[in-house]
Amino acid sequence: FKALKVNENRVQRWCQKVREPMLEKIRKMPTHLTMEQLKQQWYEGTDESRMHYSWTRYYALNLHSVFYRGTLEWRCFESTLHAGKVRANITLALAISAQAINQKKTVMRKTGISENPAFTFRTFLLRLGLIGPEYKNVRAHLMENLPGDKAWRYDKTMYPSNQHRENER
């Protein structure tokens, strides 16, 4: 949310973070999960898939739209007319969606945010496949709101190879 610079008021009302208990229940379900089973967990036992304004739609990843219309909706992006930022947001949504479709297995583990959020997020983007010069602007737009050095996890003077260079100066 920090990388996307989501307004805190929007997070509280329109694009809440994931419901952890629901996610844990889904993770414990059988490997070959059907859409009906997923729907049962998403709506917590009730079927609100025909209701346009279900309370479950106000999450960053809105699966209500999958059950209601057959489309996936990402609600975490702020409005903008900047073409580069629009491209970055679309590319991020497509990359995460593609990984979800193509990934053979998942491990439910939160990636800790290190003292250098820019480096942590950059490695996440690289794991998504946003590598190379064609994604340079996408990475730049997505990381512009994060503090830290995107190239080094820790202060670069801490690495032995860089200490040697500092001593030569």
Task: Give residue ranges: language-model regions.
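C-terminal accessory/tail domains of diverse enzymes
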Residues: 1-169
